[in-house]
Structures are given as structure tokens and as C-alpha cells.
């Protein structure tokens, strides 16, 4: 989240049980690429006086900075804005690319609703790709901004073991509810039972592309 701070925009995490944003310069749980992108983004906001979103008055522009990474070290950066455009877009992209050569794309998400839901319905690619690729179970998956993928990637190694425990014969129909980008459905398809997946439209779009 992004919010007004004591010394300028705060880009970080919510304090426990509050809507107060704690400015966090680094986090041991995230790749160094994310830290570099945050630094470049914050500098752009400060230098060009881009206002953070203030949820009480519903004023300001920048609501969130959303970054995805993959095992290859690439990053996809999404700026969630209370509007349909950003000022000084070319300078933002230049700074992000300069501090993170592994940047694959920059996406603008428009969220003008009075809500605590992070992402709005509309996306616009400012530069590069609007997706990353990740390899799992010998398959390559496409990850776009809104689609779910296991945050703890090490856990995905359990997929093959879970499939073995299931003892599928190939005659079953398997329902994959809240399927995300279809990792489990497509892993099951190698066995091969019939599988049917359900999720939000953006995730299903990625799942179909992955299939």
C-alpha cells in the first residue's frame, strides 16, 4: 500500500489491525529486485510530487505498488492508481528499468472505487509485457497481475506427491476450485483425468493460455 506519511509518501505494509501504512525500506522475505523497484518508485513520487491516495478523503493518486517476481529473477511492476493515467510515465519507466534490469513490464491498474480491494478492473500496459512466466512440474505457466500463484514456491514441489497420493486412474473428473492460473489442473491433466477449473475471469484467461 501507498499512503501519506510523516515525511512524504509511505510505501510499505499496514500496521497490525489498522489502515496505517508503515514505510518499509526493505524486507528479508522479498527479493532484492522488489526493494530496488520500491526505491525507484518512491523517488519518482517525491521528485514529481505525485500524491499518494488518502482513503478518508478519497483523494490522491497512488494506491498501491504491486510487484511480482519469478524464479528467473524477472519482475512485473503494477501501479494501482485512483485514476486512468500517471504523470511523467516515461520517467517512471526509465527509473524502474535503470534500477532493475530484470524488469519485464510495467502495468497501470485503475481502481477508483471506495473499497479496500487492491486491484480494479482495468489494466493498461505502460511498457514491456503484462505477464511473467514460471516453470512448474515441467510446464511453463503465464502469470499476469491479478492471477493467483503460490507465494511460497517451494510448496509447489508437493504437487507431484499429492497427485501420487490421490491414486487417480484416469477415469475421474476432478474439480479445481479457485484454480488460479491452472497449475494443479494442468498437472492433473498429465495423468490424465478430466479436470474442470473455476476462478475469477482474469485467472481463467491465464489458465486457458497455459493450457
Language model segments and positions:
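SAM-dependent transferase fold signal centered on methyltransferase-like domains
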Residues: 1-124, 136, 157-160, 167-171
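Rossmann-like S-adenosyl-L-methionine
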Residues: 88-211
Amino acid at each position: 500500500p501507498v499512503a501519506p506519511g510523516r515525511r512524504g509518501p509511505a510505501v510499505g505494509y499496514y500496521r497490525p489491525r489498522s489502515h496505517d501504512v508503515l514505510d518499509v525500506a526493505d524486507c528479508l522475505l522479498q527479493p532484492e529486485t522488489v526493494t530496488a523497484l520500491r526505491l525507484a518508485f518512491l523517488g519518482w513520487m517525491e521528485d514529481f510530487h505525485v500524491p499518494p491516495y488518502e482513503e478518508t478523503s478519497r483523494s490522491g493518486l497512488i494506491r498501491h505498488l504491486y510487484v511480482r517476481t519469478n524464479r528467473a529473477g524477472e519482475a512485473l511492476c503494477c501501479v494501482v492508481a485512483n485514476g486512468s493515467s500517471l504523470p511523467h510515465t516515461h520517467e517512471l519507466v526509465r527509473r524502474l528499468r535503470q534500477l532493475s534490469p530484470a524488469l519485464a513490464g510495467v502495468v497501470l491498474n485503475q481502481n477508483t472505487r471506495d473499497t479496500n480491494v487492491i486491484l480494479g478492473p482495468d489494466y493498461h500496459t505502460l511498457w514491456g509485457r503484462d505477464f511473467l512466466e514460471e516453470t512448474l512440474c515441467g510446464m511453463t505457466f503465464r502469470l499476469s497481475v491479478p492471477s493467483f500463484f503460490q507465494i511460497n514456491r517451494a510448496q509447489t514441489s508437493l504437487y507431484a506427491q499429492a497427485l501420487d497420493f490421490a491414486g487417480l486412474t484416469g477415469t475421474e473428473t476432478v474439480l479445481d476450485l479457485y484454480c488460479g492460473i491452472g497449475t494443479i489442473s494442468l498437472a492433473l491433466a498429465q495423468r490424465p483425468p478430466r479436470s474442470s477449473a473455476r476462478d475469477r475471469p482474469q485467472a481463467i484467461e491465464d489458465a486457458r493460455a497455459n493450457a
